[in-house]
Amino acid sequence: MIDFIQRVVVTQKSTMLLESERYTFDVDVNLSKTDIKTLIQDLYGVQVVAVNTHRLPRRKTRFGGVKTRTKRAIIRLKNGDTLPIFD
């Protein structure tokens, strides 16, 4: 299950969203919003209120190739809940 979460996104925007209990992850492209919600709730034991997703554009590599597209999920938790990886 944890293989579906590729990485935790740490950008300026994602750190600003941490104050309002929103966490940003890069996830597997084939996951739906309900799959992401149940995955986070089962892994961390928190209550997920909303999941927003968007697909990032492909990036060109240096020598004539492209990197695959990824899906980014912004997860909003119930007030008072936090993820242990950010403590």
Swiss-Prot record:
<dbReference type="InterPro" id="IPR012678">
    <property type="entry name" value="Ribosomal_uL23/eL15/eS24_sf"/>
</dbReference>
<dbReference type="Pfam" id="PF00276">
    <property type="entry name" value="Ribosomal_L23"/>
</dbReference>
<dbReference type="GO" id="GO:0009507">
    <property type="term" value="C:chloroplast"/>
</dbReference>
<comment type="function">
    <text>Binds to 23S rRNA.</text>
</comment>
<dbReference type="GO" id="GO:0005840">
    <property type="term" value="C:ribosome"/>
</dbReference>
<keyword id="KW-0687">Ribonucleoprotein</keyword>
<protein>
    <recommendedName>
        <fullName>Large ribosomal subunit protein uL23c</fullName>
    </recommendedName>
</protein>
<dbReference type="GO" id="GO:0006412">
    <property type="term" value="P:translation"/>
</dbReference>
<keyword id="KW-0150">Chloroplast</keyword>
<keyword id="KW-0699">rRNA-binding</keyword>
<dbReference type="InterPro" id="IPR001014">
    <property type="entry name" value="Ribosomal_uL23_CS"/>
</dbReference>
<keyword id="KW-0694">RNA-binding</keyword>
<keyword id="KW-0934">Plastid</keyword>
<dbReference type="GO" id="GO:0019843">
    <property type="term" value="F:rRNA binding"/>
</dbReference>
<dbReference type="GO" id="GO:0003735">
    <property type="term" value="F:structural constituent of ribosome"/>
</dbReference>
<comment type="similarity">
    <text>Belongs to the universal ribosomal protein uL23 family.</text>
</comment>
<dbReference type="InterPro" id="IPR013025">
    <property type="entry name" value="Ribosomal_uL23-like"/>
</dbReference>
<keyword id="KW-0689">Ribosomal protein</keyword>
<dbReference type="GO" id="GO:1990904">
    <property type="term" value="C:ribonucleoprotein complex"/>
</dbReference>
<dbReference type="InterPro" id="IPR012677">
    <property type="entry name" value="Nucleotide-bd_a/b_plait_sf"/>
</dbReference>
<comment type="subunit">
    <text>Part of the 50S ribosomal subunit.</text>
</comment>
